[in-house]
Amino acid sequence: MKLLYDLLPVILFFLAYKFYGALPPEWILAVGVWLPVALEPDNPGHAIYLATAVAMVVMAVQLALGLAIKRRLETMPLLTAAVILVLGGATLWLHDPVFILWKPTLVNWLFALVFMAPPLFGRRTLVETLMGHALSVPRAIWSRVNLAWVVFFLVSGLANLFVAYTFSEAVWVDFKLFGMLGMTFVFVIGQAVYLGLHHREDDPHTTKGDPS
C-alpha cells in the first residue's frame, strides 16, 4: 500500500496524460483557469501541462498529509517534491515541457548524492542505516550495495535523458512509469538476492545492531 501511495503522483501523471483527449472539454477548461497556461481541449500537446499540474497538486497534498500525520518530512519525499514543484512550475509558467522531462533525472541524481554523502563524512552507509537492523552482513557488503545504489541512480538519470531526447513525449511518459519502475524492481530483486547470499545469523563479524 505504501508503494502505491508513493507512486501516486507518477500514476496520476500518466493517467492525466494518456486520457487528456477523453476528458470533458469543460473539465480541462476549468482546470486551465487556475494554471499559467491556457489549456486547449483539442490540443494534444497540452496533455503534458495537465499531467504536470496533477502531479504537483498530488505531491503537495502528500507533503501536507505527511506533515500533519507524522509531524515531520522524510528526506527522499521532500527532495522529490521540491524537484517536482520547481520544475513543474517552470514547465507551466514558461510553457516548456523540457523542465518536467528533466525531473526524473534530477531526482535520481539527488538520490545518488544522498547515498554518497554519509561515507564521505566517515558515517555508515545509508543502506546499512536503513536495513542494518534486519540483516547481518559484513560492512564491506553494505558498502558495495550502497555503491550499487549510487550507480543505479546515476544510470537511471542518464536513461531518462536518453529516452526523453531520443523518443517521442508519449514514449517518455510510458518509460517514466513502466520503464523506471521495471528497472527499480529488477535492481531491488538483485540486491535482495545479493544480501541474502551474505546474510549470516549470529555472526560476530557482521554489523547487525551496530550503532556506530
Curated annotation (Swiss-Prot):
Keyword Transmembrane helix: yes
Keyword tags: Cell inner membrane, Cell membrane, Membrane, Transmembrane, Transmembrane helix
Family from the record: Belongs to the YciB family.
Role noted for this protein: Plays a role in cell envelope biogenesis, maintenance of cell envelope integrity and membrane homeostasis.
HAMAP family: YciB
NCBIfam families: PRK00259.1-3
Protein name: Inner membrane-spanning protein YciB
Source organism per UniProt: Thioalkalivibrio sulfidiphilus (strain HL-EbGR7)
Lineage of producing organism: Bacteria, Pseudomonadati, Pseudomonadota, Gammaproteobacteria, Chromatiales
